[in-house]
Regions:
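Small-residue (G/A/S/T)-rich helix-start motifs and N-terminal tracts that mark the onset
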Residues: 1-74
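Conserved beta-alpha-beta core of the PfkB/ribokinase-like small-molecule kinase fold
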Residues: 78-111
């Protein structure tokens, strides 16, 4: 059975980072990356200007739908957090899906 990692991170149009990089690397390892976007950005925050579409209100929808599907994850990886409110969403996600067999990797990036 293919291992799965929930990847909680942003998607940036420019910048070679976040979900764009994580999905590629995780997939190359033969693991299914299951992205849960925290935000969609026109470019990563290191650019002089960018547009950020905050996904805080959508994060719990992902959690609920994946829970209804009976999904489980071998790993949970968190990256860019767009707002303080997302921290609570991430804790709720971890409370739902984390088990003693789940690898948890927290990259403390908060924009």
């Amino acid at each position: 059975m293919t291992k799965k990692i929930a990847v909680i991170n942003d998607l940036s149009g420019f910048g070679r980072c976040s979900l764009t990089a994580a999905i590629s690397v995780i997939s190359a390892m033969g693991i299914q990356a299951c992205p849960l976007p925290t935000a969609i950005l026109t470019a990563q925050t290191g650019y002089p200007h960018y547009y950020l579409d905050d996904y805080t209100d959508k994060m719990d929808i992902y959690r609920q739908e994946w829970q209804k599907m009976g999904q489980h994850f071998d790993g949970i990886y968190t990256g860019f957090v767009a707002s303080e409110a997302q921290i609570d969403q991430i804790f709720h996600f971890i409370d739902t899906f984390y088990t003693s067999d789940t690898f948890l990797l927290v990259d403390p990036v908060m924009g």
